[in-house]
């Protein structure tokens, strides 16, 4: 097997061009077989096999800098840079990361996870190279979806203005393609940038005719992103006006064409943009047929493509409840930044196509767009992953909270997220939202309470409000028939107890409850509280606990710094209860890497055993006090 002889890009350079085709086939087979056992981002990587081989064949990594936007399509890059044998540990605890990781290899020159960052990083590296008078190439690979992000467009503007030697490879795959005819064929006549275009023209035209969905994709994006995006992707003129030499569109699976194009770009002065058309999931029929499903996948059967049946999740409960609420209240609309499937909003969009707004990878715009909707009496539900809400922080403060607008933040993937690791952990939403005036922050103990919080949010009249929920299966609790409006800022005492009160915020209630059950078998009976709200806190309850002499343990799956526990401590400090003993069980002040949620919780101490041990240490007998 030729692939087993490739342990470094220098090994790849010894291959003949015909051998590269053999390698491409072997790599696809390796990906399909390995990911069937580990799960991972299959479709994106099947789509960049030839492109990745060509990049490492033409350029000299790590001297030449290869940057992968988002990074989920870097598996082939990892295979070619000495990490093939680590793939059985992909995305597992202490195993191979699913994204570029500098500590893994000097060939990973930039760590990614969020989209649209590669071009800014490339510009920084190219500028540093020039200041240091070094000689190397900087190449950024970015998808057509990520290119719509404002940060990427800002970087294009800067690169073009400075005329830096940066090569941008636009990986135009089928993630957003609709099956109708578009204007890409006419686009070919406008390309004038390289000498190799004339001999490649007939081949490229044949490619486009053989993939009719490409034109449909551009038409679809033109419709979604109006004239600006049509101008961007249907015409190379804009890139050239920005200062780039534009090459393309080319077949991103034609090895010879890729090699020639990259060599041309390598010797072109100034910024270059190569527009490569690739097919997501190429080489595995199920992934080609449904690139959305196979973008990120769990384990599967290779022959059939069957995946294990998944249990109901908090996201699916959110999706069902959104439909119920929208049926009753026609002012409810949904906003998502390119995540309608992940956020569970596809059924909502099918039933209410004029009430779902997918604005693309544009979190800042999405947040202020929702604010604009709210000024006109609509009730926008901004469905966004916790990790991506970080990208709209100024808009959250300046455009939503400051104006006290009724925008509902449905914060999905809150807490530890497992295999996607540190770039996707939902650790910080509570901390960064808690300090914003006018904001209400909720977190349910289970899926039934999530539904009530969703009802509470749409009925709330006081400004912005949020609820956070995890990327986890539901608990399977009984669901109430009628949705209730919860009193703002009021906690729920689930079990009365003595000496110690456990205040649980959010879905970690299950862990706190397990700790209490364990302790009760030992005759220890702490109070168990479902906090429900981080802002406003239930101060009446907190002051009662202080007056009655309770020690307090707060439990949350979020940042220890600035989170729910910090809010409790601050509350006591403001009220003058300076002697209160409040211990925080949360995620410590470091980035938690990939693994299962169970393993991550064990690492950070978010377990029933850990909480129970904390409680025991606070009981009177542990302090040397004998109860009467």
UniProtKB/Swiss-Prot annotation:
This is 1-deoxy-D-xylulose-5-phosphate synthase. Pathway: Metabolic intermediate biosynthesis; 1-deoxy-D-xylulose 5-phosphate biosynthesis; 1-deoxy-D-xylulose 5-phosphate from D-glyceraldehyde 3-phosphate and pyruvate: step 1/1. Thiamine diphosphate binds at residues 72, 113-115, 145-146, 173, 284, 363. Its cofactor is Mg(2+); thiamine diphosphate. The keyword Metal-binding applies. It catalyses: D-glyceraldehyde 3-phosphate + pyruvate + H(+) = 1-deoxy-D-xylulose 5-phosphate + CO2. Belongs to the transketolase family. DXPS subfamily. It is an enzyme of class 2 (transferase). Homodimer. CDD domains: TPP_DXS, TPP_PYR_DXS_TK_like. Pfam families: DXP_synthase_N (PF13292), Transket_pyr (PF02779), Transketolase_C (PF02780). Its EC number is 2.2.1.7. GO terms for molecular function: 1-deoxy-D-xylulose-5-phosphate synthase activity; magnesium ion binding; thiamine pyrophosphate binding. GO terms for cellular component: cytosol. Mg(2+) binds at residues 144, 173. GO terms for biological process: 1-deoxy-D-xylulose 5-phosphate biosynthetic process; isopentenyl diphosphate biosynthetic process, methylerythritol 4-phosphate pathway; terpenoid biosynthetic process; thiamine biosynthetic process. Binds 1 Mg(2+) ion per subunit. Binds 1 thiamine pyrophosphate per subunit. The gene is dxs. Catalyzes the acyloin condensation reaction between C atoms 2 and 3 of pyruvate and glyceraldehyde 3-phosphate to yield 1-deoxy-D-xylulose-5-phosphate (DXP). Keywords: Isoprene biosynthesis, Magnesium, Metal-binding, Thiamine biosynthesis, Thiamine pyrophosphate, Transferase.
């Amino acid at each position: 097997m030729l692939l087993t002889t490739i342990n470094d890009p220098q090994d790849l350079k010894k291959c003949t061009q015909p051998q590269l085709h053999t390698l491409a086939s072997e790599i696809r087979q390796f990906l399909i077989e390995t990911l069937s056992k580990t799960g991972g981002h299959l479709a994106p990587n099947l789509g960049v096999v030839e492109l990745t081989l060509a990049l490492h064949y033409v350029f000299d990594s790590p001297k030449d800098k290869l940057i992968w936007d988002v990074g989920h399509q870097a598996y082939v890059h990892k295979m070619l840079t000495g990490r093939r044998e680590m793939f059985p540990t992909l995305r597992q605890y202490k195993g191979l990361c699913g994204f570029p990781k500098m500590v893994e290899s000097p060939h990973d020159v930039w760590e990614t996870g969020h989209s649209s960052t590669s071009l800014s990083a490339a510009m920084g590296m190219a500028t540093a190279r020039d200041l240091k008078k070094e000689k190397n190439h900087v190449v950024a690979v970015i998808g057509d979806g990520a290119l719509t992000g404002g940060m990427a467009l800002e970087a294009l503007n800067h690169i073009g203005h400075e005329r830096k030697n940066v090569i941008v490879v636009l990986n135009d795959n089928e993630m957003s393609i609709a099956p109708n005819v578009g204007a890409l064929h006419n686009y070919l006549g406008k390309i004038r940038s390289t000498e190799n275009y004339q001999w490649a023209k007939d081949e490229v035209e044949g490619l486009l005719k053989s993939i009719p969905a490409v034109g449909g994709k551009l038409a679809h994006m033109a419709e979604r992103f109006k004239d600006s995006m049509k101008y961007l992707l249907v015409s190379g003129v804009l890139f050239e006006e920005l200062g780039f030499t534009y090459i393309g569109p080319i077949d991103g699976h034609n090895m010879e064409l890729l090699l020639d194009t990259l060599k041309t770009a390598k010797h072109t002065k100034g910024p270059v943009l190569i527009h490569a058309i690739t097919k997501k999931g190429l080489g595995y029929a199920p992934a080609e047929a449904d690139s959305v499903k196979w973008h990120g996948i769990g384990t599967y059967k290779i022959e059939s493509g069957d995946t294990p049946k998944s249990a109901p999740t908090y996201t699916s409960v959110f999706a069902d409840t959104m439909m119920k609420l929208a049926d009753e209240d026609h002012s409810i609309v949904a906003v998502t930044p390119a995540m309608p499937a992940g956020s569970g909003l596809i059924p909502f969009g099918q039933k209410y196509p004029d009430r779902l707004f997918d604005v693309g990878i544009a979190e800042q715009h999405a947040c202020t767009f929702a604010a604009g909707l709210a000024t006109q009496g609509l009730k926008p539900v901004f469905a966004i992953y916790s990790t991506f809400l970080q990208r709209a922080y100024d808009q959250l403060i300046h455009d939503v909270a400051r104006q006290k607008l009724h925008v509902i933040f449905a914060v999905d993937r809150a807490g530890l997220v497992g295999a996607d690791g540190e770039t996707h952990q939902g650790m910080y939403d509570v901390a960064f939202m808690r300090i914003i005036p006018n904001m209400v922050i909720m977190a349910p103990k289970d899926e039934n309470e999530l539904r009530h919080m969703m009802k509470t949010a749409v009925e709330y009249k006081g400004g912005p409000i949020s609820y956070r929920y995890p990327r986890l299966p539901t608990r399977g609790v009984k669901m109430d028939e009628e949705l209730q409006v919860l009193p703002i800022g009021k906690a729920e005492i689930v079990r009365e107890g003595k000496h110690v009160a456990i205040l649980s915020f959010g879905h970690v209630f299950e862990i706190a409850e397990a700790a209490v059950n364990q302790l009760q078998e030992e005759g220890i009976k702490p109070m168990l509280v479902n906090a429900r709200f981080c802002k406003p806190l239930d101060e009446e309850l907190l002051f009662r606990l202080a007056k009655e002499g309770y020690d307090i343990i707060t439990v949350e799956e979020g940042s220890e710094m600035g989170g729910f526990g910090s809010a409790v401590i601050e509350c006591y400090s403001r009220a003058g209860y300076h002697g209160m003993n409040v211990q925080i069980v949360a995620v410590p002040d470091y980035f938690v890497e990939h693994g299962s949620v169970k393993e991550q919780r064990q690492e950070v101490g978010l377990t029933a055993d850990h909480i129970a041990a904390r409680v025991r240490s606070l009981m009177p007998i542990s302090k040397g006090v004998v109860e009467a």
